[in-house]
Regions:
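Electron-transfer interface patches adjacent to heme c in soluble/periplasmic c-type cytochromes
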Residues: 38-56, 61-309, 313-415
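Long, compositionally biased, charged low-complexity segments
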Residues: 8, 18, 47-51
Length: 415
């Protein structure tokens, strides 16, 4: 059995066990409902588990053939091989999966016997599939390990690690936005860019990416969003452009990352075709299934004041008027409506991110797990939850007392 299929089979088994423990029928019904389907069409639990496992493999390891962009166009394999040692990689927010490291290497790192200042060490980590979201082909050329191809996966931006081994090194946390990652700084290293291009990308800053920049030439990045807690939410992007994850996954895979396939968006007069072979479409169902299985993380024990959070819930539903839009179990009205740009606390901005989208509007962001991913608002203009509350209080003339504002922050931290 090929290694990739063996990994999928193993992961399918991991998914089937909890489904069986919870009751297969209920689990299947919940999965179908989450995908916008109908329980009238029975779905085999084992098949769904395999689909989720395949999606996990896609999320972590599939580049959709984007090596043609990152290698052939941007020449990032040359940059990595010559200038990106592990310490440099960690400094721009790249993460290392400690579970991909053999025990002997872990011991050597702990003993200080591994040189983390040499690009050759990065190549060794790539050979192990240990650099989260980066897929490299390392071949021996004239007796020397050589990085010949490099591509990226969904996990680059939408996964991080728990830092259990060291900062930036630990177990994967899929779905968690990597707000340490500085994709603009990484792209700016490309020798294929001119000075203006390098400056534009370098201006983004950590945790931000502009998914329209290479389409409309404008430069106004947004924060990397979570890829968890999306079960049951149909408008999955800041601007609600598509009604399912597969829409945005295709757009990013092809239009942004250079994956081999086609994406069309008539509302933007957009048609992008990379290559003649479609390496994207067949992977979208599994990828979506896996992402919908990712739950928002619960807040750490002791991270908020329980009594204050209870009072804050009353503020959230009352004086703060938050539940007017942040409603329902997902704390969003995104399945019902979108909002004009003027409703956004990040607007007015220039250029307006909404104006560059297909809907020209914003969705209400879901709040589960909000404690985990500062900064806030789509442009990252609020550094803390206290800043979020203060902004709403001022812009909406809510007249919250200091105690109400503080309690509301504690409630948000509890979600």
């Amino acid at each position: 059995m090929p290694a990739r299929r063996r990994r999928i089979a193993d992961r399918a088994a991991d998914v089937v066990r909890p489904l069986a423990a919870a009751g297969v029928g209920a689990a299947v019904a919940a999965f179908v409902a989450a995908c916008g389907g109908s329980s009238e069409a029975p779905v085999d639990a084992a098949e769904q588990a395999a689909l989720i496992a395949e999606g996990k493999d896609t999320f972590r390891f599939d580049t959709f053939g984007d090596e043609r962009f990152w290698t052939d166009t941007l020449k990032m394999h040359e940059v990595i091989a010559s200038a990106v040692d592990p310490l440099t990689a960690l400094s721009v927010g790249l993460k290392v999966d400690s579970e991909a490291l053999p025990a002997s290497l872990v011991e050597a790192i702990q003993a200080g016997a591994v040189d983390l200042t040499k690009p050759a060490t990065t190549l060794a980590l790539l050979r192990l599939d240990a650099v989260v979201g980066v897929k490299g082909t390392v071949e021996t050329v004239n007796g020397v390990d050589t990085l010949t191809r490099v591509g990226i996966t969904c996990a680059l931006c939408h996964s991080t690690v728990d830092d259990s081994f060291a900062r930036g090194i630990g177990k994967r946390l899929d779905g968690w936005p990597n707000r340490d990652l500085d994709p603009g700084a990484i792209i700016a290293l490309s020798p294929a860019l001119d000075a203006d291009g390098k400056a534009s990308y370098a201006s983004w800053g950590p945790g931000k990416f502009d998914p329209r920049h290479n389409i409309d030439g404008k430069n106004k990045p947004v924060v990397i969003p979570p890829a968890y807690g999306l079960d049951g939410i149909h408008s999955v992007t800041f601007t609600g452009d598509g009604t399912e994850l597969a829409y945005w996954n295709r757009y990013v895979a092809v239009a942004e990352m250079g994956g081999q396939g086609t994406v069309t968006e008539p509302r933007l007069n957009l048609v992008v075709q990379n290559g003649i072979e479609d390496l994207v479409t067949a992977k979208l169902p599994g990828l979506q299934a896996y992402q919908l299985s990712l739950k928002a993380p619960a807040p750490p024990a002791g991270s908020y004041d329980v009594g204050a959070a209870l009072r804050g819930k009353a503020v959230f539903e009352g004086a703060g008027t938050c539940s007017t839009c942040h409603s329902g179990p997902q704390f969003t009205d995104a399945n019902i409506r979108l909002h004009p740009a003027s409703d956004s606390m990040a607007e007015p901005e220039s250029p307006s991110y909404a104006s560059r989208s297909a809907t020209k509007q914003y969705r209400t962001s879901p709040l589960k797990g909000i404690w985990q991913h500062p900064p806030y608002f789509h442009d990252g203009s609020a550094a803390t939850l206290a800043d979020v509350v203060r902004t709403y209080d001022t812009r909406r003339s809510l007249g919250l007392t200091a105690q109400q504002a503080a309690d509301l922050v504690e409630y948000l931290k509890s979600l």
